[in-house]
Amino acid sequence: MIKNAVSLVTGGASGLGRATAERLAKQGASVILADLPSSKGNEVAKELGDKVVFVPVDVTSEKDVSAALQTAKDKFGRLDLTVNCAGTATAVKTFNFNKNVAHRLEDFQRVININTVGTFNVIRLSAGLMGANEPNQDGQRGVIVNTASVAAFDGQIGQAAYSASKAAVVGMTLPIARDLSTQGIRICTIAPGLFNTPMLAALPEKVRTFLAKSIPFPQRLGEPSEYAHLVQAIYENPLLNGEVIRIDGALRMMP
């Protein structure tokens, strides 16, 4: 059960990450809330209670992630669950023929670096700390949950970088599950559809309504709390491993 678990949530200051940190804390887990120094992570951690600790982290930095894990070890003694919610997006066509301009390579690399390399960085370092845990009755020592996107499967115009970065997260899930199985560490990936996150909240109401109607059922945007609920379900179900779970209301994005 999630109660008394020690967790690390990246991207925990907003959106899916914040909802996850909030649910875990309410269920009695301890949370290392990791986000950029410029985020509202410190305020969020104070709001969520004494068992939530903010650590400033750039997920692409080995030093930052190692510091967050050391905080988990020093303050709570171990790490049971890592949830990778940190990420970024861009909307740029491969080539803009109207302006005769190609997609900037550095922008493509930045998205890959944060979403793919950053996720793997957190996974590999978390696994090292989890491996020191005493196994439970199933031999489990830890659980890792990643965040991909339906864009990994149904990428839209202008989403080459974002889709590639999330498809890589999908692709690494099974081999990492196999890598870590000998130490009793499970890993799953959640692929959200259209969710009521700060990014979508900034869109006009007319656009949000249109997007909601594109979802077969239920015809509404997903709530971050529903993502967080799935994180808890993955943690508490020992047979979920090496799997990618779409949470999208049967949405299949058309170009």
From Swiss-Prot:
Found in many tissues including CNS, imaginal disks and salivary glands. Highest expression in both embryonic gonadal primordia and mature ovaries and testes. PROSITE patterns: ADH_SHORT. It is found in: Mitochondrion. Signal peptide: none annotated. Changing residue 163 to F: Pupal lethal; pupation is developmentally delayed and pupae fail to enclose into adults. One of its GO terms (molecular function) is 3-hydroxyacyl-CoA dehydrogenase activity. It catalyses: a (3S)-3-hydroxyacyl-CoA + NAD(+) = a 3-oxoacyl-CoA + NADH + H(+); (3S)-3-hydroxybutanoyl-CoA + NAD(+) = acetoacetyl-CoA + NADH + H(+); testosterone + NAD(+) = androst-4-ene-3,17-dione + NADH + H(+); 5alpha-androstane-3alpha,17beta-diol + NAD(+) = 17beta-hydroxy-5alpha-androstan-3-one + NADH + H(+). It is an enzyme of class 1 (oxidoreductase). Disruption phenotype: Embryonic and pupal lethal. Pupation is developmentally delayed and pupae fail to enclose into adults. Males, before the onset of lethality, have small testes and degenerating spermatocytes with a large accumulation of small fat-containing vesicles in the cytoplasm and almost no mitochondria. Photoreceptors fail to differentiate normally, are unable to form proper rhabdomeres and contain smaller mitochondria with swollen crestae. Larvae display reduced ATP and mitochondrial morphological defects, that are indicative of mitochondrial dysfunction. Substrate binds at residue 149. NAD(+) binds at residues 14, 16, 35, 58-59, 85, 162, 166, 195, 197. Induction: By 20-hydroxyecdysone. It comes from the Eukaryota. One of its GO terms (biological process) is mitochondrial tRNA processing. The active site is at 162 (proton acceptor). Component of mitochondrial ribonuclease P, a complex composed of rswl/MRPP1, scu/MRPP2 and mldr/MRPP3. Belongs to the short-chain dehydrogenases/reductases (SDR) family. This is 3-hydroxyacyl-CoA dehydrogenase type-2.
